Amino acid sequence: MEQLTPLIKRFTFKRQDGQNFPRFSGGSHIIVKMNEQISNAYSLMSCTQDLSTYQVCVRKDVEGKGGSVFMHDQCNEGCEIQISEPKNLFPLAETGNKHILIAGGIGITPFLPQMDELAARGADFELHYAYRSPEHAALLDELKQKHAKHVFSYVDSEGCSLKLDELISSQPKGTHVYVCGPKPMIDAVIDCCNKHRYRDEYIHWEQFASTVPEDGEAFTVVLAKSNQEIEVQSNQTILQAIETLNIDVECLCREGVCGTCETAILEGEADHFDQYLSDAEKASQKSMMICVSRAKGKKLVLDL
């Protein structure tokens, strides 16, 4: 473990059996299971060529679900912890005239291995890294040592902000834009790309924090296999409601990114808030992630 900033720690994992971890590509994440109630997704930031270890960075958030506090306060060197195999929902495009990477705060982590991959390809790329103040600039020195001419940093506390419209509008045709960071930054980048007529397939983003509205409408869920009916409250997920019936549903992340709780929809329409299903899969209304997604109407019938 390494304390990078007052709020950010880097964790290095090794397998108990001494074997290498599975291969992964830049942009991949793993699910770290702290206990039966808490599992969080974290981007892998280690070198894709060195599989002897996996590395992640965790920013302590005392107002979060408890996972980051657990990692900071209870995870010590030598402790055992369960992690999933890597999955990549934020891969680099195989082609493109240029790649613009935009990071906010801890959102820098998936870009470390991606920058190595782009450099190895000989691709044209830039990283634009925005952070609140110098003490929040985790990994900036490492990035500049490896990719100095590709890294541009912006410090809010010093009055240096990212001029997003200028950046997006000045790129050549065929540029891919990637963003990872706080939701307002992601929304701003997507809106700016749309304004300048970037095609959807050239805009890539990742955010692990839930985007589910805090004040949703209550609705009814019918479990077809067990012939049970439950009421999902406005401040409750379908998964949480089902768990009150002691029905076991596998779910690792509880954030709509891992896909383990995907459930078939037999009747009704889902309001999708996950990052796992494609837009086409969401539109088909064949399945949903019950850890974050909700009903569009008053009733859903699920294949459970």
UniProtKB/Swiss-Prot annotation:
Give the Enzyme Commission number: 1.14.13.239
Which pathway does it take part in? Amine and polyamine metabolism; carnitine metabolism
Which InterPro entries is this protein grouped with? Answer: 2Fe-2S_ferredoxin-like_sf, 2Fe-2S_ferredoxin-type, 2Fe2S_fd_BS, Benzoxazolinone_Detox_Enz, Beta-grasp_dom_sf, Carnitine_monoox_B, DmmA-like_N, FAD-bd_FR_type
Cofactor note as given: Binds 1 2Fe-2S cluster.
Which keywords fit this entry according to its UniProt record? 2Fe-2S, Flavoprotein, FMN, Iron, Iron-sulfur, Metal-binding, NAD, NADP, Oxidoreductase
What family is this?
Belongs to the PDR/VanB family. CntB subfamily.
What is the name of this protein?
Answer: Carnitine monooxygenase reductase subunit
